[in-house]
Amino acid sequence: MDKYEFNIKVEQIKKLVGKSDYETAMKIADTIDWRRVRNTNLLSMVAMVYEKNEDYEEAREILLLAFERAPIGKRLLYKLAELALKEGNIDEAEAYYREFSDLAGDDPRQQLLRYLILKAKGAPAQQLIHSLESYTSQEIDEKWLYELAELYSIAGMADRCVETC
């Protein structure tokens, strides 16, 4: 495939992603050899296309390509950990979490990722509450506040549940 044809396909993918037509975007993405692409933003977008189509293995492979080209990308490590969890690979997710934590310093997403891993392991509500409280104390996110309120309810902490709501 020459550069002109590649650029046309990439533009088509971008337009389809803009329209949330991930299925068609994936069909076009399947025709491209992503190992030759150096642009990490483009690789990340294509990985998202595969993820939206629940092809987590291909999404992970493409994110690994992006990570090889930008190994200091904590955003990529976070996404790789999320994909590993979606694939049910907790050990791999924990490895990415450790790398992410080493790079991230005090990024609040560390706590969120820790929560997601603990949840995947089936940890008790009290343990999940601690991680989610740490995250929501730094980041106001309605989705996670709601989930925290649900955990309070499960743990029998009705007063904290109402307070969070």
Protein language model regions, located:
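Canonical tetratricopeptide repeat
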Residues: 45, 79, 113-116, 147
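Short coil turns that delineate tetratricopeptide repeat
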Residues: 37, 71, 105, 139-140
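Residue at a conserved register position within TPR or TPR-like alpha-solenoid repeats
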Residues: 16, 50, 84, 118-119, ...
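Residue-level detector of the short coil/turn that links helix A to helix B
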Residues: 20, 54, 88, 122-123, ...
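TPR-adjacent "capping" and linker segments in tetratricopeptide-repeat scaffold/adaptor proteins
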Residues: 1-8, 31-38, 133-139
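Alpha-helical repeat scaffolds
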Residues: 24-32, 58-66, 90-102, 124-137, ...
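Alpha-helical segment of the N-proximal tetratricopeptide repeat
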Residues: 5-35, 52, 147
